[in-house]
Amino acid sequence: LNLMRVYLDAVFRPLIYSKSEIFRQEGWHYELDAEGRLSRKGVVYNEMRGAFADADELEEDAIMRALFPDTPYRFVSGGDPEHIPELTYEKFQEYHRRFYSPSNAYVYLDGDMDIDTVLAILDDEYLSSIEPSERLAVPALQQPVKASPQRIEYELPAEEDEHDRYRLAWGRVVGEITDRERMTAMQVLSTVLCGNNQSVLSREMLAAGLGEAVNMIVWDGCAQPFVKLEVRNVSEENIVPAGEKLRAVLERVANEGVDRRELEAAMANLEFQLRERDYGYYPQGLGISFGVLDSWLRGGEPDAMVEVGRLFDILRARMDEGWFEELIRAVLLDNPHSCEVVMVPSHTVGEERRERDARELERIAASWSREEAERVKAEQAALDGWHASPDSPEALATLPKLELSDISPEPEHYPTSLGELGGVPLLRHELSALGISYVSLYFNITGLTGEETAAVSFMGELFGKVDTAGHSAQELSSLLQLYCGSMNFSVDVYEQSADKYCVKLTARVSAIESKIGKALGLLSEVLTTSRLDSEREITDILRQRRTGMFQQIVNNGHVSALGRAASQFTAGSAVNEWANGYDYYCWLKRLTSETDLSGLYSQLEELSARVIGRRGLTVSVTGMHSEAVDDAITELVNVLPEGETVTGSGVAPRGVRREGIEIPSDVGYAAMGGLSGEFDGHWQLAGRVVSLEYLW
């Protein structure tokens, strides 16, 4: 209830009308330094400058401008940094009055609550005390438009070759969000066509040398969902051939029919995901609310997009009616509501933009009178003073709070028992999981060198994506979707202190209980018989992962900076840099420049023989206890080789240093850290307090 009041206060009673500093801090403001140089700053302003360094963001914004020129979707929801300075404090207040009104609100409640108490708080403390206003109409739908082709430049570091870094993207409106069967069918088709390198469209484009990766994403969080079909990292001279090849493959699939086994596998996996309702870092109630609002905002029933019901029975019945083939024609090939965007790499566009901004700021500063410059300095001083001033006791007293006596001193209980199964340690977490079993295998790899850790991390990228002794990569892809909810691999580091850590290669699989035997059989096959010398598949995955890591570093520079700083003084963080951080990116980058990967193949085979085995293995299972699950785990463990005990000195901290990493962005990220003694829960609690994450 306390947190609910905090959010309701923030929405309906913000201090923005009496504290202009909030607008200047969160939105934007001018600053003059001691030499008289003018700059713009602000939380949202800086965030969006960082976002516009992301080629994906620029591409999606261009698609939405082209597809929805007459609707609010043509605007960037977070604000275009070139236009954010056009927002005045007065307009900001006006927009809040107009849009953040109970008359314009939808109220969604989720969770275990006393509903009468909650409704009374909503009514008595908030809704009834605010004057009704005009309810705003939902904007009209966009009429079909066939937009002219667009070319959008994006920044590339000087050391990166521009030649093969073009992107071709198609935008296609699918229909209306309330047509759930059509939207879900397009999600299924996106997996069948481009779900991985073995999917028909990806496979043919890669084999033809027309691009490094092919992606198809259904954007369904808007009134008229659209598909983005993208060929990534293609040369300029291959843009037209790539488009022609896309069309030719899609026409062939539409004419000859979509593979029924792949359709069934994709549907089985999507149905699992929708019924599981795992929203990752989002609380489940928040994730469900997105589906509720998709329908409710547009006049539908609130639960229309949430319940799975017979949705997949209907889709399966339409498989043999030619409906999926017709969708390919109607949405991807002959769509009157479409656009094409080409992303053009540039070594100079970023610097040109920064120089243009600098000249504009110089012009603005030169146009000010002495009085205007003094006013900006006064506002800046007021903002600095506001930042430095503590909240008054009266203000602090208004914050709802819990006493320590309101919180149980006991941690939340997760049922855990330690036993043995198949001769290896077993952690069992017996709880209801909607009929789903989650099995994790932890292979000890503590002691590997940094280079070896990077190779094992990459080996995890290959598992499930290359041929095995029993199946081709294409066959394996369909089987994994058919029998598994998920199967993934990662290198995870667990730190006890600055110099004590353990590292695990983790294999995770989830499946409904009736399919867990098949799922673990596939996991066994992947772990023990994967072809780790599959040249074409490995080369493709290597390039894709290198590009993905580059984008990750640019888009999440704060995470990269924190990890890099921590690796200077803790061994575990240094290992994580090789497994998942900047050192891993450098390792991938070096390998993508090599023409002979035979050394990598040999290293992968040698490491697989060392780390994949019963020795050093711990198994974890979550779900209701089941003999069938235990039997499947035992069978898997028995198939694994003995393996070796991994030994070695591991990775040492990198040592304290000042370090900088250049990225193509208008925004930089700084991180610093240091040792704080033995780790305990106090530091974790302090971290949540200072980062405000407790508001979630």
Map each language-model feature to its residues.
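M16 family metallopeptidases and their MPP-like homologs
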Residues: 1-13, 19-31, 57-82, 104-110, ...
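Active-site neighborhoods of enzyme catalytic cores
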Residues: 17, 24-42, 47
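Generic recognition of flexible, low-complexity loop/linker segments
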Residues: 93-97, 155-158, 201, 215-219, ...
